[in-house]
Amino acid sequence: MKQFIVLTVVLLAIQELQGGSVVTVDDKCTCKDTLNTLTKGQLIDRLVLCNQRNDNLEKIIDGLKKENNILRKENDGLRAENCQLSEALKREKEARQKAEKALKECQKNTENLKETIEQLKKELAEAQKALEKCKKELADCKKENAKLLNKIEELNCTITQLQEKLERCRGRERDLQCQLDECKKKLNICNNELIACRKQQEELRCKIERLNTEIEKLRKQNAACEKDLNTLRCETSEFLAIATQRQSQLTSIIQRAEGESSAIKASYIGFRNSHDLTCAPCAGPA
């Protein structure tokens, strides 16, 4: 009966090693009858064999327990690592969500930048067109400036000519004064012509005074024009209107001066043609 109990324990141990499958001794099993038929020596041999197997099984069980402990420790480590990985995964998910959000914002900013770039391209094209227009206007302005400079040179030449004419008028004035002095000397002889000479002398004096007034006015306008010309070289934009106005004024003055000069010349020629200015004593016998 004891051998049967030992065998049952051994079978249970084997059952546990084989995965925990339940092994029961059936009531109809003939092992009990077989053990009863064995002799004492056979039972002892069988028991020794069972003890040896039991020792081997205990060693195997101890090894399995050690492996189980190792596996349990590894499992604990894996659990800890799993927790760490779970936390890392959670952080990665959060980082990924933040990255996706940042990516969306970046894409949105990229679209905005693209729109801004397109707008800037349009503005650049418009600026280039405006630049081309400005260049063309600058070229036209340079051409106009060159024309104005040429006009200034022409005006300077005209002013020089006018000054020369003024000098000639002064010379003529001196000649007329000399002639008037001669006429005064001839007053004693030319009593009949004295009244006419005085009238024409008075007219000539009035004309000379008007001419002097016009000359003085012309000098002032000429000085103002010179000053304006020096200023207008730096301020081209204001030059057009002022230069045109000055040109008109100068032209009118020159025309009036030329008209007055022509009138004086005609008067002088008429005076000489209508009066005999020959001095009888100076002329001598004919």
Curated annotation (Swiss-Prot):
Instruction: Name the SUPFAM superfamilies on file.
Output: Tropomyosin
Residues carrying a glycan = 156
Which molecular function terms from Gene Ontology are attached? single-stranded DNA binding
Q: Which GO terms describe its cellular component?
A: nucleus; Smc5-Smc6 complex
Provide the residue span(s) of the region labelled Helical: 61-235
Task: Give the residue range of the signal peptide.
Answer: 1-19
Miscellaneous notes: The DNA puff II/9 proteins have a proposed intermolecular coiled coil structure with possibly intermolecular disulfide bridges formed by numerous cysteine residues in position D of the heptad repeat.
Q: Report the protein name in the record.
A: Puff II/9-2 protein
Its gene name is II/9-2
